[in-house]
Amino acid sequence: MNLLNLFNPLQTAGMEEEFDAIKIGIASPETIRSWSYGEVKKPETINYRTFKPERDGLFCAKIFGPVKDYECLCGKYKRLKFKGVTCEKCGVEVTLSKVRRERMGHIELAAPVAHIWFLKSLPSRLGMVLDMTLRDIERVLYFEAFVVTDPGMTPLQRRQLLTEDDYYNKLDEYGDDFDAKMGAEGIRELLRTLNVAGEIEILRQELESTGSDTKIKKIAKRLKVLEAFHRSGMKLEWMIMDVLPVLPPDLRPLVPLDGGRFATSDLNDLYRRVINRNNRLKRLLELHAPDIIVRNEKRMLQEAVDSLLDNGRRGKAMTGANKRPLKSLADMIKGKGGRFRQNLLGKRVDYSGRSVITVGPYLRLHQCGLPKKMALELFKPFIFHKLEKQGLASTVKAAKKLVEQEVPEVWDILEEVIREHPIMLNRAPTLHRLGIQAFEPILIEGKAIQLHPLVCAAFNADFDGDQMAVHVPLSLEAQMEARTLMLASNNVLSPANGEPIIVPSQDIVLGLYYMTRDRINAKGEGSLFADVKEVHRAYHTKQVELGTKITVRLREWVKNEAGEFEPVVNRYETTVGRALLSEILPKGLPFEYVNKALKKKEISKLINASFRLCGLRDTVIFADHLMYTGFGFAAKGGISIAVDDMEIPKEKAALLAEANAEVKEIEDQYRQGLVTNGERYNKVVDIWGRAGDKIAKAMMDNLSKQKVIDRAGNEVDQESFNSIYMMADSGARGSAAQIKQLSGMRGLMAKPDGSIIETPITSNFREGLTVLQYFIATHGARKGLADTALKTANSGYLTRRLVDVTQDLVVVEDDCGTSDGFVMKAVVQGGDVIEALRDRILGRVTASDVVDPSSGETLVEAGTLLTEKLVDMIDQSGVDEVKVRTPITCKTRHGLCAHCYGRDLARGKLVNAGEAVGVIAAQSIGEPGTQLTMRTFHIGGAASRAAAASQVEAKSNGTARFSSQMRYVANNKGELVVIGRSCEVVIHDDIGRERERHKVPYGAILLVQDGMAIKAGQTLATWDPHTRPMITEHAGMVKFENVEEGVTVAKQTDDVTGLSTLVVIDGKRRSSSASKLLRPTVKLLDENGVEICIPGTSTPVSMAFPVGAVITVREGQEIGKGDVLARIPQASSKTRDITGGLPRVAELFEARVPKDAGMLAEITGTVSFGKETKGKQRLIVTDVDGVAYETLISKEKQILVHDGQVVNRGETIVDGAVDPHDILRLQGIEALARYIVQEVQEVYRLQGVKISDKHIEVIIRQMLRRVNIADAGETGFITGEQVERGDVMLANEKALEEGKEPARYENVLLGITKASLSTDSFISAASFQETTRVLTEAAIMGKQDELRGLKENVIVGRLIPAGTGLTYHRSRHQQWQEVEQETAETQVTDE
């Protein structure tokens, strides 16, 4: 395989100009010989005495070039003047020794050998082409059987296998009328005589005529391979090799170690084996040795070549002297240490250094402190240049000396060189693009890099010994890009969610909080001040304190109509601290933003507001000032932690005693047998959970308030100045939960498997733990540490897969012109709005006009980017859904358009062309991955009981609306009974916006009507949580069928009430075999005794009772619509483990089918049940035209529908987790996207991580990029093959233009790993996973990599087609086209 075009330095081929694609194919023997500079005939490497390479050996200088620059081997020709001369004595050409890195040799094999990649990588390509099984081909190749290559006139079949005995018998019988061969020769003969074009024709006909699915799949696969060979002009027999290329010697070096030993590359060993065996075989053939010996030697040669190409792929791996398997050519390129991931995608670079980081609290945001020693080393060449320019040194050598002596002038020059020259800092792991940022260096003494505290959040850095790397951008372009795009002060917003990432934390927050808190009756309370300067004087002369409440006149800056600032003076009631803080506010930011106690969230809002109102530059300056102020007041405040700050609540002892008494009572009940062990455990856990909460509440009440005397002399409560409370309250450090452990009680602990230990830890850290309590605590804590280590690796792998699947998504055009999009609504769960509509549509582009619901006028036209102003307007006008453009529906073929993506979150305006949005999406989802939990949650005691709700209440005033799936009937009492499966009551506020959405189960009684006005707290619906009713939709007289006591039903009498009921028995447990198949059903008769039919059909109403149903009606009873026929007791809802955290995100993106997946209705129609099989029930859905769709469902599963019920396509009919593939098939792309976005967001929301929906949508786009051809039409695709969506669109457009029939296709959902591997670019796929398979397939297909993605371009070393690289490539293409046009024109004129 000529993979080598990946590796050889491209200059040698005279390819100075850029290339735009790389093609891979199978090398023909002629090609291999044309690469070669001579045949390697001997296995010798170098002479152990002279260290000179042996002639014709593996390191031969005659073949591969001289060992020393411009010097032949025997030393006759030396120096440059003989360049190009070939020495007549030793035959070596005089040239540079680096040609030994690129000159190849070859080995002429004495017998053909099959290439193991085409034989063994599944599915076997040789097997596919020849239509033989891998086992058969191996038997032929490894000389266990003959294969008939030409049957002649005999009854033998072509490709038939014969054992040795068979062969000799047939020889006796038919003489030489037929040909049969053994080994690679036989296979090669078969390949050579295969008529590819004819075979394709036959297969196409077979495809038309056959009906079986497996056959179609098999034929389609074979067809694909044969067509690829036909198209690319490669010959089938090239998969069998006559000539073996030999890698250039400097790529498989042999290095002499001291003591006469050698370190060598494994490849040399492998090559030696091949040459030895090949030479032995040649000799045997010359001697006409017996067949059996020759065959053995040929087999050994085949095995030696196998090992060289891919050791260990077949049989045992060849091992070296030390028993470890040798590293073959295939091992060189695959895996983490292989060529792709080690050397091509990540390289070590020059002009870099690393050191420990420390705090630089006096720096400005765009600066960092760089140790002088490091700077001197990093900027050496610049310093040499300056020294020479200033005449202080005449040569580089002299300059070097000066620098090493560190003469004073050098430091002055260093200052000069470093000025305005940004450097890049990087902290590993680089999880998102903010892991590398540019700074202007400030020279400092010492050896540690100083980092600005506000960028720590982006780097996820702290100062407990973290190290960071420094890189110097050298070229002018690189410096420009670093300064304009990467400078820390240009990256204020996070690309994941558009919120500021430069947010103060810890000490700064604490200082600002302390500064802006107010105190009751502080010194000088109630004073009035003329301006801030006066406040300053009063504060510094100690007339007032920091927290004193005062009134002050403040000057604010407001924009007028012309957009210029003018001062406005207002009086504010505020505190001294806030008034002082107002001085650093940027122009245009109102004072009310700081006129409150600043906690972390408030500070974040403050910076966000500043960015939106005052722009980037002012915000950066403001952030810096906030930092200096915060640090200053944190120091002056002297807030520290003392043991006495952890106040233990007085009520603790009483609360503990109470809880202990309750537990004792439960234990007694358990001993008397009144409760089961499970109930006892749940209740005990419950009691202790509540006790812990009560103690925590008492403690917080105690901590958060303190009694003070106000000016009037009354005792009042004010917020406490307890240090620990202030730290937690401000959001600087710690939380209520941690304070609870310090001075409340530690509470319940979990075992490593997630279950809760019922003995709580009643002490806290201040009191100290007993030995037993300490042991219980360590149990779960250790799990946490193990989790964290695993989590990091898993999260990294998820990120890698995400990056791989999206790496070629770049914004390439401004607008694709589509009007498709998704309808966005607020996310409502239960009764709460989790994410408001404005947050979901902010920064998107509208797909259709947004219309005011009350007046009907257009608020926003289609194609508008929604800014803060616009979304606020939409919000106020009461619009509850907006159709916006989304990456999933973008029509751009390779890449995305700016309008479908919307706002670039990190810049706050429409995304630029060239932005690598795919990678940004992958990083935004992967980066918080390390914060997600690994554990799958077990719902503990307290949570599972809350699940058995029996009614639902409105939380707000408004109007009740029923969802479109809502189906209900009114019963005789006039109650509305729900008979639909996925019914919801939605509550809209007075302007028609959705406020809450409640699911209502089947059989619930609705207490509201559609369109009714309701009050908060009103009950909307009630139901019995413990049973599931079976409800009739028709009225009539009950007539039972197959309801026989003792056969299909059993009578049960309640001991307490004495009432008897009928319960349906499970078919397996019935006595006679005949009764096993009987299904107890109920039919309805009208007053004339005729069976009632389903309206509009002639099918009688018939409803089957499921197993375990308690029948509540009697034979002959008159019933009305909505009456209950039977109740099915619900098993107390089993606590299903919900997969949470990282594994859940991975599961969604890998599009895995969930365990125990639920089932959706394939068609809209009526449900009935067919004949049961042993463990399964047969569920039939019949549509309006009477077409039935059957499925078998195992009896353990809970079927949510019953006989005669009408279901809609895509509605859930069997309980369980939903399979995303089903959603796509039955409900379409929008429903699927909504499901995945919702589920992924759910996981991140639990951890309090904000990620913009569009990142998830970008990944969904990539998961949906392939389609299955359902009917090829006249497009040349093969029915059933998987192709890129863009290719089908293009082919269909072309077909329609030519008036041909377009192809029909079905959407396919691929998991991210699969999607990465099925990409068009083989280079990208090979560098991701399964390198061997990807390259084999690509070579057979003769694939061409268009180098569209980022990865392929990094690998071949071009500028990536994103950012500035996009414009570079575009202008290059334009120039090239212009040149082509010119040449075409000149040719025309010449002619």
Curated annotation (Swiss-Prot):
List positions binding Zn(2+) 1. 72, 74, 87, 90
Give the family per the record: Belongs to the RNA polymerase beta' chain family.
Ligand binding (Zn(2+) 2): 816, 890, 897, 900
> May I have one GO cellular component term?
DNA-directed RNA polymerase complex
Question: Is Metal-binding tagged as a keyword?
Answer: yes
EC code(s) of this entry: 2.7.7.6
Please name the InterPro entries in this protein's record: DNA-dir_RpoC_beta_prime, DNA-dir_RpoC_beta_prime_bact, RNA_pol_asu, RNA_pol_N, RNA_pol_Rpb1_1, RNA_pol_Rpb1_3, RNA_pol_Rpb1_3_sf, RNA_pol_Rpb1_4
What the record notes about the co-factor is: Binds 1 Mg(2+) ion per subunit.
Select a single GO molecular function from the record's annotations and give it. Answer: magnesium ion binding
Q: What does this protein do?
A: DNA-dependent RNA polymerase catalyzes the transcription of DNA into RNA using the four ribonucleoside triphosphates as substrates.
Q: Name the chemical reaction catalysed here.
A: RNA(n) + a ribonucleoside 5'-triphosphate = RNA(n+1) + diphosphate
Gene name of the encoded protein: rpoC
What is the organism of origin for this protein? Neisseria meningitidis serogroup C (strain 053442)
Q: What is this protein called?
A: DNA-directed RNA polymerase subunit beta'
Membrane-spanning parts: none
Gene Ontology process terms (BP): DNA-templated transcription
Q: Write out the entry's keywords from A to Z.
A: DNA-directed RNA polymerase, Magnesium, Metal-binding, Nucleotidyltransferase, Transcription, Transferase, Zinc
Swiss-Prot/TrEMBL cofactor(s): Mg(2+); Zn(2+)
